[in-house]
Amino acid sequence: MIKLFSLKQQKKEEESAGGTKGSSKKASAAQLRIQKDINELNLPKTCDISFSDPDDLLNFKLVICPDEGFYKSGKFVFSFKVGQGYPHDPPKVKCETMVYHPNIDLEGNVCLNILREDWKPVLTINSIIYGLQYLFLEPNPEDPLNKEAAEVLQNNRRLFEQNVQRSMRGGYIGSTYFERCLK
């Protein structure tokens, strides 16, 4: 009993001195779940994930380089911010690459049902990555954030394809300039 008391006392002294022998901070439910999600990732060959701080799994980047469809040969970067409410709340996902896409607006907001009303705690980071990849293979003009791009896709697929190619090469679509995003 005395040994246990002295260990507790020693730990208190170390913490008050600012030195801890290992992390005394407990991992949150969000951190534990994101660790599990990351460990179980099964990334498609068109995707890559990176962490600017390897100790911070709650903030990371995803790069998608589609190998087919309208966006073939493009390189699109997404930021993920996982809140403490995860997995009960979806992560915040933003597209950092300005893209001409019906489901991604010019500010980078993403219209993906599993990031909004269809989110369920059983969904994982892998589910979101596959959902984002699918948006590049099959843009959905029925649920748009960029209404202009959605209209063009519905009414003139050839013009939509030309606009996507022009935007990925770097150029103007109307009065909006798009940076080059070809890999």
From Swiss-Prot:
InterPro entries for this protein: Ub_conjugating_enzyme, UBQ-conjugat_E2_core, UBQ-conjugating_AS, UBQ-conjugating_enzyme/RWD
Effect on the protein upon substituting N39A: No effect on thioester intermediate formation
Modified residues (Phosphoserine): S50
Catalytic activity: [E1 NEDD8-activating enzyme]-S-[NEDD8 protein]-yl-L-cysteine + [E2 NEDD8-conjugating enzyme]-L-cysteine = [E1 NEDD8-activating enzyme]-L-cysteine + [E2 NEDD8-conjugating enzyme]-S-[NEDD8-protein]-yl-L-cysteine
Modified residues (Asymmetric dimethylarginine): R169
GO molecular function: ATP binding; NEDD8 conjugating enzyme activity; NEDD8 transferase activity; ubiquitin-protein transferase activity
Post-translational modification N-acetylmethionine, affected residues: M1
Consequence when changing I38A: Strongly impairs thioester intermediate formation
Cysteine pairings via disulfide bonds: none
Annotated SMART domains: UBCc
Modified residues (Omega-N-methylarginine): R169
Modifications made to the protein after synthesis: The acetylation of Met-1 increases affinity for DCUN1D1 by about 2 orders of magnitude and is crucial for NEDD8 transfer to cullins.
Stated consequence of mutating K12A: Impairs thioester intermediate formation
Segments of this protein annotated with the region Disordered: 1-29
GO biological process entries: post-translational protein modification; protein modification process; protein neddylation; regulation of postsynapse assembly
N6-acetyllysine PTM positions: K3
CDD domains listed in its UniProt record: UBCc_UBE2F_UBE2M
Residue intervals of the UBC core domain: 29-173
Gene3D superfamilies given in the database record: Ubiquitin Conjugating Enzyme
A cellular-component GO term for this protein: nucleus
E.C. designation(s): 2.3.2.34
Region of interest (Interaction with UBA3), ranges: 1-57
Comment on protein domains: Both the N-terminal docking peptide and the catalytic core domain must bind the UBA3-NAE1 complex simultaneously for optimal transfer of NEDD8.
UniProt subunit comment: Interacts with UBA3 and RBX1. Interacts (N-terminally acetylated form) with (via DCUN1 domain) DCUN1D1, DCUN1D2, DCUN1D3, DCUN1D4 and DCUN1D5.
Protein task: Accepts the ubiquitin-like protein NEDD8 from the UBA3-NAE1 E1 complex and catalyzes its covalent attachment to other proteins. The specific interaction with the E3 ubiquitin ligase RBX1, but not RBX2, suggests that the RBX1-UBE2M complex neddylates specific target proteins, such as CUL1, CUL2, CUL3 and CUL4. Involved in cell proliferation.
Protein name from the UniProt record: NEDD8-conjugating enzyme Ubc12
Gene assigned in the entry: UBE2M
